[in-house]
Amino acid sequence: MVPLPIWKPIFAISNSIAQNLTRIESALAMVKNAGLPPAAISELSRQAKIRATHYSTRIEGNRLTLEETAEVITGRRRIFHGRERDVAEVRNYWDALTRIEEWAAKGRPVTEELIQRIAGIVLNGRRSGLAPYRDGQNVIRDSMSGGIVYMPPEAFDVPGLMGEFVRWIDQAETDEIPVVIIAALAHYQFVTIHPYYDGNGRTARLIATFILHRGGYGLNGIFTLEEYHSRDIAAYYDAMDVGEHHNYYMGRADANLTGWIEYFTGTLSDVFEAARQQALTYSNSSTIAEPDELRRLDHRARTVFALFLRQEYIKSSDVATILALSERMSRIALSEWVNDGWIIISNPSKRSRKYSLAEPLRRYIDSLKH
């Protein structure tokens, strides 16, 4: 198959977009300079990921509440009779979000393989392989009338369009197009191609989040863009509805995307401003010096450390859940952390082994509670 030319999205940097980008940069700088302690970052990130998981799946019709979503993610409740699919969607989105944060931290590029891996987790869980593109036509219908809202490109064209799509992202980064605009356009184009029968919206939002994290706009994971999309779902869908016709081949492929970028950057600027306010609140209220042992922890270790803010002991199953790992990999990670000296084995029983914080970090946790 001869590669298609690189996708050339049509848009202009309007005054609104320029102002939004300025607000985003300002909030980003303030959060970076807020001096948030790692413990606060870990807890804020955990809360944001739970909200992101809830609201992104809710957009697609998931029936679990925010509290129920948190129960599924933390393992406090695993079964909701009659809502098994909702539970699986929440679990899978959390796992995918955990993975993209790790991949972004490693600087992995956007490739078709990465996208197919994200989609695989969204659709079938963390042990899934690459998700193949659809092999037939799909349509998006109005949930009330049943009428066709959008008809994506034919399955035959999907591989070529996806190849063109990832090449554009690579070229856009080379051309130093602002990261936020790349994320906005990536979100739009993935949904436009609609390469899967299901999970396109969730995967598109994850791709946009990955690009933001990878490009330095991750804010340590303390923001929730999905929540703001969900607050006004009509505005979200209206902003993406830029074509004059519901058929991909009759206008949407060549649509002007300035309006969508205005929506995306405006929403993100509101999200970043909320994160800035939250960061300042935590920074001003935190006067206790953090121990060196805590500052040396990497991202995964800090995520696990945050568990001790709510419980005295943890088990390998807790680590497996929060980091989207297998039980075996969680035990390996715990063994490494025991050797590093920041956690200790409290109950050596192989069947019910428990871990707690080493003394310096336990004292720090205790000081936060008084």
Please report, for each region that a protein language model flagged, where it lies by residue.
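FIC/Doc superfamily catalytic core
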Residues: M1-H370
